[in-house]
Amino acid sequence: SSAASDVYKRQVSSFGSYAYSENEDTFFIDLYAGGTVKTEKGITLTCETDFPHGGTAKYTIKGEAETTVAIRIPAWSEKSLLTVNGEAVDLNAVTKDGYAYITRAWKDGDTLALTMDMTPHVVYASAKIAADSGKVCVQRGALVYCAEEVDNGKVLPLYVKAGAEPKALDFEPETLGGIVPVEICLLYTSPSPRDV
């Protein structure tokens, strides 16, 4: 419909305001999107990334300015590594409210690189929501994998084995427009395969 098309156009045209924001003293990186952006302080950041399938986002600086760059450290990444010009930054010392704040005199060619933990893990639904009680999904980075009955038929007799650790497989560019499949051990508890 025309209305849906207009909403899509507005969202696409406003993507930059979701990816980056800026106030008088800090430039915020909210999303790890490839491309180039110029700050009000006069430096330009170019991002090379393999996100969301990979866990790296590297920003190369062009220009010079003394300012703060704050990059979002995602809560799902248990072991993030942030470097400036290849040297590790102590995230505990610079992180506040989910952002790592780096204040320095940025110079032409400086790099800011974030490596995120992409280890897949099982996420259990809240028991407070009766309809979801006992259900799980697998999360790898920002992506959530699940098998829903509407897409897969009756999957209720399948259970994630206690202590099962999901494993990420190799990237498959032709599957679902490109995806890293995740493998996990399931238990089948129905007496007959016909029940699935």
Where are the regions that the model predicts?
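Surface-exposed beta-strand/loop patches in extracellular or lumenal glycoproteins
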Residues: 66-74
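C-terminal beta-rich recognition modules with glycine/proline-rich loops and embedded aromatic residues
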Residues: 1-62, 95, 104, 111, ...
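Solvent-exposed beta-strand/loop surfaces of large extracellular or lumenal domains
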Residues: 77-103, 122-128
